[in-house]
Amino acid sequence: LMTGVESARDAYIAKPHNCVYECFDAFSSYCNGVCTKNGAKSGYCLILGTYGNGCWCIALPDNVPIRIPGKCHR
């Protein structure tokens, strides 16, 4: 068992209140910026996904909130 190593997962990054970062252009760099600023390897705009059009991050650290089932409370 390794200590001091954080695990990561691929997921929708969440704003406060369980809302996704909305996006509208699959080729924009917006989501990659949001994801990498939060420690992910990369990110992109997932169109028509489970929670609509939202930023999907690759290898997002476990300490960063992700979109979970339930309502987005704006």
UniProtKB/Swiss-Prot annotation:
Keywords: Disulfide bond, Ion channel impairing toxin, Neurotoxin, Secreted, Signal, Toxin, Voltage-gated sodium channel impairing toxin. Expressed by the venom gland. One of its GO terms (molecular function) is toxin activity. It holds the Pfam family Toxin_3. GO terms for cellular component: extracellular region. It is found in: Secreted. Transmembrane segments: none annotated. Disulfide bonds join C19-C72, C23-C45, C31-C55, C35-C57. SMART domains: Knot1 (SM00505). Its main location: secreted. The keyword Signal applies. GO terms for biological process: defense response. Residues 1-7 form the signal peptide. Alpha toxins bind voltage-independently at site-3 of sodium channels (Nav) and inhibit the inactivation of the activated channels, thereby blocking neuronal transmission. Belongs to the long (4 C-C) scorpion toxin superfamily. Sodium channel inhibitor family. Alpha subfamily. This is Sodium channel neurotoxin MeuNaTxalpha-11. It comes from Mesobuthus eupeus.
